[in-house]
C-alpha cells in the first residue's frame, strides 16, 4: 500500500489536487524535521548550538511518529483516530499559522511556513488514515543526497 491508496480511501480527499495538497504538507513537515535535525548535528559538531524553528511538541518525531528508546515507532505514545485529527486541526496547524508572529520579517522561514499553512486545510477526516500516511512518509529519509531525489 502507498500514500495514494491511503488517500483514495479518505473521504475528505476526492481529487488528485487533494492528494497532492495533503501529501505535500506531510512531506514538507517531514523534510523540515530532517533538515532541522541535520542542522542540530552540524552545530553540535562545530561546538555551537542551533535553535529549531519548530517547538518540540510540534516536531515530527513528537507528534507524527514518536519513537521509543530503541528508535522504533512507539505505538503506545502515538496519537491516532480522533485524537490525531484534533491535534493536527486544533494545535499543529494553529501553531504553524502563528509562526509569523515570532518571525523577524517576511523573508524568514517562520513567516513563509506560516503563510503556507494559512492556506492549507487538513482534509483527512480519519485519524487512522492519517496515521497510515504518516508512517509511509516517515519511512522516507531526506538526509542523504541520493534520497532527496526519490
Indicate where each model-derived feature is located.
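Non-catalytic, mostly N-terminal accessory regions of nucleic-acid modification and defense proteins
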Residues: 1-150
